[in-house]
């Protein structure tokens, strides 16, 4: 079986909803990053482009972004929707295709624009049309599980898990402070500088809070009426951004005399209780460790999507 190597990557600076990219459609944001990542003379060697997208207009924004970036029309592209895991699933598919010998070079990643996401509403033929507002039935958060369409489903799930593991708001806020501190340190050290694309003149990620204190976090109101833990300060924001990696086979790496940045060793995808969605991160880690015959102690860094 082939090896799957990451040979390069780029991402935009991350903007918050209605911030620095508020008038920039997702396909244009993605195209800017794709152009910065893949040199023109390499684009014809790309076997396919896989784009994760969670809040777009459906269709095939991956193909639209690739054409907007002036890739050769012969390069196929498609879109993956696994909501918050869309970009990662695009990468998983890319690695699987490389390892199975179906491709030698794939560009994979994701893009979302909360600022320009289309307004979605129930069709008047839908049985829940009147229940959710009729002509004013616009929603921004998709329905994730059977039953009521609850825009706060993810927040309620996170609150349930926090209560189940007896996590206090004060404990959670300490992790928030740590997260922002580490992000700030990485920014000041220029850790990601070689991989950042200054779309529309952007020079910094908008979500990193330079001035934030435990006292401030502890004073914020909770998001849920009966909630005890989650606030606007310890939950993720809505963002605009794009990120892509070039994934190549060992054959491609040798042929072009490249030095890989990393190897994608393996991956798993799991499902779990939609009412307690954050728990699935634990299930995925456990399954992957068992599959690869590793223990947690063998891994230097774990990174979990906070959404």
Report each predicted region and the residues it spans.
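Glycine- and Gly-Pro-enriched alpha-helical subdomains that act as flexible
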Residues: 250-298
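Conserved catalytic cysteine-centered active-site region
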Residues: 52-104, 148-153, 211-237
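Flexible glycine-/small-residue-enriched beta->alpha junction loops
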Residues: 106-160
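Beta-strand segments within the central parallel beta-sheet cores of soluble alpha/beta enzyme folds
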Residues: 43-52, 77-79, 106-111, 171-178, ...
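N-terminal extracellular/periplasmic Venus flytrap/periplasmic-binding protein-like
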Residues: 11, 23, 27-32, 171-255
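Conserved active-site "lid/cap" helical segment
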Residues: 1-69, 73-76, 84, 157-169, ...
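Active-site-proximal alpha-helical scaffold in enzymes
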Residues: 82-112, 162-192, 245-251
């Amino acid at each position: 079986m082939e090896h799957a190597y990451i040979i390069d990557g780029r991402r935009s600076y991350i903007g918050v909803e209605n911030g620095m990219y508020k008038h920039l459609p997702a396909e244009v944001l993605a195209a800017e990053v794709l152009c910065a990542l893949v040199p023109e003379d390499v684009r014809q060697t790309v076997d396919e482009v896989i784009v994760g997208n969670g809040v777009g207009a459906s269709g095939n924004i991956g193909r639209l972004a690739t054409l907007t970036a002036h890739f050769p029309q012969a390069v196929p592209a498609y879109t993956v929707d696994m909501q918050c895991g869309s970009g990662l699933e695009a990468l998983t598919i890319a690695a699987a295709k490389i390892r199975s010998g179906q491709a030698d070079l794939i560009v994979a990643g994701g893009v979302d624009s909360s600022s320009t996401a289309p307004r979605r509403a129930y069709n008047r033929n839908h049985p829940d049309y009147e229940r959710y507002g009729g002509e004013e039935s616009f929603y921004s958060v998709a329905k994730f599980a059977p039953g009521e369409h609850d825009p706060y489903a993810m927040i309620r799930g996170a609150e349930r898990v926090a209560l189940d593991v007896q996590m206090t708001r004060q404990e959670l806020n300490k992790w928030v402070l740590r997260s922002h501190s580490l992000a700030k340190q990485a920014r000041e050290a220029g850790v990601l500088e070689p991989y950042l694309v200054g779309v529309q003149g952007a020079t910094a990620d908008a979500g990193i809070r330079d001035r934030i204190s435990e006292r401030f976090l502890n004073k914020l109101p909770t998001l849920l009426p009966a909630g005890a833990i989650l606030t606007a300060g310890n939950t993720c924001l809505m963002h605009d951004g794009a990120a892509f990696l070039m994934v190549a086979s060992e054959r491609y790496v040798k042929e072009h005399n490249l030095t890989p940045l990393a190897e994608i060793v393996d991956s798993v995808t799991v499902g779990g209780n939609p009412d307690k969605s954050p728990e699935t991160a634990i299930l995925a880690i456990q399954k992957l460790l068992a599959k690869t015959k590793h223990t947690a102690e063998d891994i230097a860094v774990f990174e979990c999507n906070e959404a």
